[in-house]
Amino acid sequence: MGNVQSQEGETRAHAVPSQDATTTPDNANNVPKEPRAQSMISIAADDLNQEGEMSDDNQQEGGNNRTSQNGTSGSSGHTKRRSQTSGKKTHQPYSGPCVPTIIRWRGGGEVVYVTGSFSRWKKKIQLLKSEDYTVLLQLRPGTQRFKFLVDGIWCCSSDFPTATDAEGNLYNYLEVEANEKLGASIDERLSQVHTDLPMEEKSESEQYSTEIPAFLTSNTLQELKLPKPPSLPPHLEKCILNSNTAYKEDQSVLPNPNHVLLNHLAAANTQLGVLALSATTRYHRKYVTTAMFKNFDV
């Protein structure tokens, strides 16, 4: 870059004649040809930062040289970017102890993988088959979200709780608790678990008998008011088939439902001996609502 700037300085020095050259042509050869080129060559990479810090003072003084002002403003922008990047916090990976956790799949299949937040949803881990598909993972404490890939199909296990993300996709999650005694053996952990179980109460509750419950034989107990069933959540009270369509000409087009309404069975009151059932499912970005009607004899 220094060579290029010196060449530009030489061309400018030859192109623009000085005042001495116009008055005394004999002394034109004695005048130094590249005073501006020397000033530009002397600017190094370290000097740019110093010029950037002094750019505000130069703007207040209002120098006549525009090229120097442009150079200082560019260098000041460079120093601002370096200060912003130096202020960013670097991500520190988790260095604490991990908890050995067994993840099990009991839904069958030939090839089963699992992926989740513990691998940033980028790596698939294959499960080993014995009686069921299992894998032992070293997970950090906290909430871990994951999903199974069974024969190329994404599935959720009924053995773990499920939740939905912002787009309505289902996934399993697991609360991994930090164990203080990570060095304890498996036998010690199993002994602690089995000693806490009330074995006697469990055996008494599983006894069979031929006695009929009293509330089935006594008329007074049948007349007692049972507690009311819990009311439906507010988002399930609004059925999509009862909403007004945006297109009056085409009644088959329905508005997009809330993701909590998916895979719920809705039933209408039996009127005129017809039973109506409906369910809404999702396939990628499309929603399909199916209504079924059947004759019902009261």
Swiss-Prot record:
ADP binds at D250, Q251, S252. SMART domains: AMPKBI. InterPro entries: AMPK1_CBM, ASC_dom, ASC_dom_sf, CRP1_MDG1_kinase, Ig-like_fold, Ig_E-set. SUPFAM superfamilies: AMPKBI-like, E set domains. It comes from Schizosaccharomyces pombe (strain 972 / ATCC 24843). This is 5'-AMP-activated protein kinase subunit beta. One of its GO terms (cellular component) is plasma membrane. It is found in: Cytoplasm. AMPK is a heterotrimer of an alpha catalytic subunit (ssp2), a beta (amk2) and a gamma non-catalytic subunits (cbs2). The beta subunit serves as a bridge between the catalytic and the regulatory subunit. Residues 19-30, 60-77 have a biased composition (Polar residues). Residues 1-98 are annotated as: Disordered. Residues 48-59 have a biased composition (Acidic residues). Keywords: Cytoplasm. Its main location: cytoplasm.
